[in-house]
Amino acid sequence: PDFWQNDTLNDKVKVKLMEIAEEFAKETEIEGKVEDITFTGSLASYNYHSKSDIDLHLLVDFKEIGKNGEIIKDLMNLLRIRWNETHNIMINGHEVEIYVQDSTEKHYSAGVYSLSDDKWLVKPSPEAKTLDYDAIVDKATSISDEIDDVRTQYRQKNYEKANEMAKKLSEKIKKLRSAGLEAGGIYSIENLAFKLIRNS
């Protein structure tokens, strides 16, 4: 797509993504703790299509933020959901989706590009179109967490907020499904993430 030039990320795209990541880090007070910013998922591999999201990962050692890794993970996830909910950022027609990843956890993906170092950490291969398990789980977990968030709002009797969030989420799930079908394969990241959500 329009993101790559001679196997490296387009400079304008890179600058914009770095600005987004830095703004998120500043607003969530994790500035100075971000070890790397990576671009991953289908747009960083050969599984992309017109409805693919831009998966922007901020790598942080959760132990640097607090002792309880699970609580920090939940907090980072909540901050990420709130950010994605209130910022509808598009680049070249693709929505930017932020993730905060524990830098001590291994992340397996078909393609991972470091924005900080401007180089491939995992270079995708056109011949090896394998299932990107981490991308599938990340996508499904992201939606599942948002479903939980809607439930929480409803239980707290924030009905208007829950309704607004549910409508937005419904559109997101529809997009996920149609994106998977458009990608043409039953093995697309979006289609498998949709099935994972549906069956859980």
Regions found by a protein language model. Name each.
Residues 1-52, 60-200:
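Catalytic core of pol beta-like nucleotidyltransferases
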